[in-house]
Amino acid sequence: MDRVGVIAERPPLVLELPRPVRLGLAAGSGLLCSVAFPPWDVGAVAFVGLIPLVVAVEGASPREAAWLGYFSGLSFYLATIWWVINTMTTYGHMPLALSLVTLLLLCGVLAGYTAAFTWLLILGERWLRLPRGIAPLAAAGLWTALEYLRTFLFSGFPWALLGYSQHRQPTVRLLASAVGVYGISALLVLVNATLADLLFRWLRPPTAGGRLRGALLPVGLACLALAATVGYARVLWTDPTGGSPIRVGLLQGNIDQSLKWDRGYQTATLDIY
């Protein structure tokens, strides 16, 4: 397909949002995604939580998209890992003010990954002229790559990966045995980006090919991924022995964190287990 044909698949934008609205959508997206994590644990929200962020960066410059992504990531991590303040003050014996500063710095660094996601996404659309039908796939791959990078870069910080939000969703979490948490993250982002793409197509005036022209690829892949998830879960749920199911539980040793790493209590700690 030539350059003219590629550009033709990306009709003119219809969303001219004021900056305060974009900021509100970005921050709201971060807060919405945090609802999928403890203590709320509404995992289903993760399937739509990124849509406001995708809407916010639509039509933005790469630089503006980066700041919107940063703002979204900052709101998400502040709402998700705020509890580390208690850990730092109680067990690290840090002053409260210093704990707050440390939390802000930590969340600021982590938000950089979300900023990189939105920056690279818009950069790819602007410079590479990605067809809109490819954008959801690019978003899923880019997000997953950045999560993997965050797991190992600078000693790694694999907390609050998007896929972890499905730990209470038995159908989805079983997929982790095949593709890991990163595969679940990719599935969630693919669904979010596909739904956002459908929203843009619905808002755009109809063209000769219809609103949904070019959406078959991401929609088809998203449906296929969801169907494969359900099918894989049903296979794992099958009882191959025909015996009665058993329930397995895990119990923590309830070791006081102030004593956990004290060598003087090492033997007593092991005895508890």
Task: Write out the residue ranges for each language-model feature.
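Soluble catalytic regions of membrane-associated enzymes that act on cell-envelope
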Residues: 233-273
